[in-house]
Amino acid sequence: MTTASRRPAAPTSPGRIPGVEYRRPPAWANKSPQQILAELRPGRADPLRVLETLIQLYNNQHTARAKTVSHKTRLERAQFLRRYFRDLREKAGYRTIPDPRNLGQRHLQAMVEVWQREQLAAATIQTYLSFLRGLASWLGKPGFVRKPDHYGLSPEEYERHECARDDKSWSAHGLDVEEVLARVTAFDARAAASMRLMDTLGLRRKESVMFRPHEHVVPFARTGLPESEREADEYGWTKGKGGRTRWGAVRTAEQRAAVELARSLVTGQDAHMGDPARSLKRNLRRLDYALEKFGITQRQAGVTAHGLRHGNLNDLYESLSGAPSPVRGGRADASADRA
């Protein structure tokens, strides 16, 4: 799955995350958010109740744009904010949890210091600060959350690197993909087939489990893409980050074989790669367990499931540009990137 995200032809979503939709209580009828919050008087209302009210009112909104955010973002942001206020008491030493409307710079500084002690990854800290900016925007306080260096964070602690610096593929770590998949197949054929989809189509871990091999691979004519961009007779699609449809040409014999194998294992035309008797969460855990069972972990082998997608994208880069990707010793050439 390698072409850019596209808007045409929006097929049915592979699924939603439960537990992140809120129904407006009848008591809120004909009331504005400001009126609802005014009934929760600072100093008297339970701070966590105020937080839940804010989440119900605003959590579906994007921080900076006039649009809604994905169900995944809603879930992760709500979970973080609840944990943040609990951690102010449990980790930062505050005797009482503050009302979200009274959150001050000292509260932000205290939790940044907790994150520093815990040595959280730069990407994690950036995400946490982004979630706090969202809370500030709900409260009408744009600019309340300042730049990371204001809180004493060094660039190494908050600057995330969008481009990979190392080759994270299985082959780069001495693993024979076919040999590993043969062993996994004997244990769990579905898990192995999902891994093969990651390897050949460049799917992410979750995408490989949610992939519906009969529905998600279609003739080019059904993609809605311009004829000038046609690279194969069939294309696969997934719902990428942000809910956008991502199309990718199924151009090689290996890709077609992976799709046919997947189709042979599922139970129906609309079936996904996971075991139908298990939830999405349990199917993802089963995939992780299969990897762990054969030593495919960061700790044991230096790689994760994502290494299959990483290898696919590096191979694609080389096939399109004619040169190895930068992480494989090639030059970081802008003209090659455009290939």
Model feature map: region roles:
Residues 210-258:
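Conserved tyrosine-mediated DNA breakage-rejoining catalytic core shared by Y-recombinases
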Residues 1-75, 79-82:
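Basic/aromatic DNA-contact patch characteristic of tyrosine site-specific recombinases
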Residues 175-205:
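Basic, Lys/Arg- and aromatic-enriched nucleic-acid-binding interface segment
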Residues 190-191, 203-204, 246, 260-263, ...:
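Short, cationic motifs built from Arg/Lys/His that form the positively charged side of catalytic pockets
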Residues 196, 307-339:
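C-terminal catalytic core of tyrosine-transesterase DNA break-rejoin enzymes
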Residues 250-321:
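Active-site/catalytic core of tyrosine-dependent DNA strand-transfer enzymes
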Residues 58-164:
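N-terminal core-binding DNA-recognition domain of tyrosine recombinases/integrases
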Residues 158-179, 242-254:
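DNA breakage-rejoining catalytic core of tyrosine-based enzymes
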